[in-house]
Amino acid sequence: MPIIIDKDLPARKVLQEENIFVMTKERAETQDIRALKIAILNLMPTKQETEAQLLRLIGNTPLQLDVHLLHMESHLSRNVAQEHLTSFYKTFRDIENEKFDGLIITGAPVETLSFEEVDYWEELKRIMEYSKTNVTSTLHICWGAQAGLYHHYGVQKYPLKEKMFGVFEHEVREQHVKLLQGFDELFFAPHSRHTEVRESDIREVKELTLLANSEEAGVHLVIGQEGRQVFALGHSEYSCDTLKQEYERDRDKGLNIDVPKNYFKHDNPNEKPLVRWRSHGNLLFSNWLNYYVYQETPYVL
């Protein structure tokens, strides 16, 4: 089934070229089907790239989704045209009186700051509080997951000596959890972060369950409130070349950046990346949408 997006959204052309089923709002409104309302709070500076990554995954399900893109009103985005935000994005103030079936809170390149130092932290806290009573299930990604764990449960983040950067093997820690339906015992996911949350802190919170972690990369998947809150510390949504672009960007800036681990063939940046996370990335998002959004949400929000 399709995702419903604005007919002029630039990501639409990319998705159609990849045979991702998209539908315009005009076409959807002629169908007698209630689409799931999904909000994406896009905190990334590379907004259009992140749009395509997430829409690619949530569009690969049998569900019809009405997608609403959100940006932070209290933060000035310097890497995206204001025209793009005006045309395709809303703010929390625009939607705070609505209810949503699902919400995705993305990562953000602010993890070396304390949460309180982030210029939009107060606005983000209001959105996370709103999600507890107005959203059926919220999926938090990377820094968004760290922010959610801190705000809702007081779980701290800690600086790493070196950036966690690459594609890492993870192990399923809980069996018979719907979010992991169809997962192999071992699976891969990308990570790109300078901070971590610790397994010991997660296990001290009785409302949280650790679902998957990595010996090298640490905590990856955590669930809370019986699935109303999902936290993914990795980046299962990443495209095949995202880590490559991050590596080349930092290298060209003269930063001391290592080659992402387990990513390029033979760990040689002149070789093509090896994509080993795509199937489980699709599975993660489809399981979240099916079991924690579609199966749990009321017909009338």
Swiss-Prot record:
UniProt GO molecular function: homoserine O-acetyltransferase activity; homoserine O-succinyltransferase activity
UniProt-listed Enzyme Commission number(s): 2.3.1.31
Site (Important for acyl-CoA specificity): 111
Location of the protein in the cell: Cytoplasm
Catalytic residues (positions): 142 (acyl-thioester intermediate), 235 (proton acceptor), 237
Pathway per the UniProt entry: Amino-acid biosynthesis; L-methionine biosynthesis via de novo pathway; O-acetyl-L-homoserine from L-homoserine: step 1/1
Result of changing residue 237 to Q: 19-fold decrease in catalytic activity
One GO CC term on file: cytoplasm
Key words of the record: Acyltransferase, Amino-acid biosynthesis, Cytoplasm, Methionine biosynthesis, Transferase
Coiled coil: none
Pfam families, sorted: HTS
Effect of residue 163 to M: 13-fold increase in Km for homoserine
Substitution effect: residue 235 to A/N/Q: Lack of activity
Family annotation (InterPro entries): Class_I_gatase-like, HST_MetA, MetA_family
One example of a Gene Ontology biological process annotation: L-methionine biosynthetic process from homoserine via O-succinyl-L-homoserine and cystathionine
Protein origin, superkingdom: Bacteria
Effect of residue 237 to D: 6-fold decrease in catalytic activity
Reaction(s) catalysed (UniProt annotation): L-homoserine + acetyl-CoA = O-acetyl-L-homoserine + CoA
Acyltransferase is among the record's keywords: yes
Residues carrying the site annotation Important for substrate specificity: 192
Described function: Transfers an acetyl group from acetyl-CoA to L-homoserine, forming acetyl-L-homoserine. Utilizes a ping-pong kinetic mechanism in which the acetyl group of acetyl-CoA is initially transferred to the enzyme to form an acetyl-enzyme intermediate before subsequent transfer to homoserine to form the final product, O-acetylhomoserine. Cannot use succinyl-CoA as the acyl donor.
Assembly: Homodimer.
UniProt record similarity statement: Belongs to the MetA family.
Record's protein name: Homoserine O-acetyltransferase
Gene name, Swiss-Prot/TrEMBL: metAA
